[in-house]
Amino acid sequence: MDALEDEDVSESVDTSDKQPQDNTELHEKVEAVSLQPRAAQPRTQAAAQADAVSTNTNSALSDAMASTQSILLDTGASLTRHIAQKSRADAEKNSVWMSNTGYGRDYASAQYRRFSSKRTQTQIGIDRSLSENMQIGGVLTYSDSQHTFDQASGKNTFVQANLYGKYYLNDAWYVAGDIGAGSLRSRLQTQQKANFNRTSIQTGLTLGNTLKINQFEIVPSAGIRYSRLSSADYKLGDDSVKVSSMAVKTLTAGLDFAYRFKVGNLTVKPLLSAAYFANYGKGGVNVGGKSFAYKADNQQQYSAGAALLYRNVTLNVNGSITKGKQLEKQKSGQIKIQIRF
């Protein structure tokens, strides 16, 4: 998810590292961009904001945006996906599972300079059956992110624990809810170094249906999720940086399409998925007394993969592409193994 919109222009521009010769001309350019729709913005004017901010300001903005994407949204989306893909038959058994997901991303915006990010997320979970209609579970998430900013670098380490419950209203409909909390440790490296910590909370509600037509399975789902990342204050060289808390409300809609067939004792289930995330939330970064705003962006995600079931073991492999207004390349791949008992 992208966290900065082209039409959102910061209240002021930090020029501590790069001083244009004519400040009046710069402010006129920024004002002109704010009054024009995206399609009408000249490329040279749209680039003025990103080019004008200092290295420290650019790094703080980029880190805030990357944290919103990977911490608030990726973790919640992966949990929603796990809950949605649990079948009614799974509710009659207990299971343990582990998944590993790799993300590769490139970001660009008129308010921060282009950067790339690599992230690895590992999740360990347990699902327990309480009755033929009720299932509960717990998920522990650990992720490590490496960012390459313009003349700077960043690193995030994130740990979060979630609990969920899923109730089947009948053979098709289900409702599920989850809640979790976590901790984010961050490091920024320009010519100076800064270390700081933030906390996270998440909660979500999902409603879905499983339609079975012979060997075909169609699983539509919809939900709402609230995610919050706390504020942070830190020093980056001579600059005092204040990052406001970021709260994101997400409306989700997803559709999974699968076909199940057998090859001997092995069950094969190819799977295609599409999901839409409507994200609402704004945050801010203050560097040296000058404020810059950013906001959550809507996303679409498309996935393809397959599940292999042999006795009580399931292996899932899938790849995804995520699109948004300012997402250049967003690709991920996941492998997941589950054991039922």
Stretch-by-stretch model annotation:
Residues 43, 51, 55, 93-95, ...:
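Membrane translocator/pore-forming domains, dominated by Gram-negative outer-membrane beta-barrels
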Residues 1-124, 132:
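Outer-membrane translocation/initiation segment of Type V secreted surface proteins
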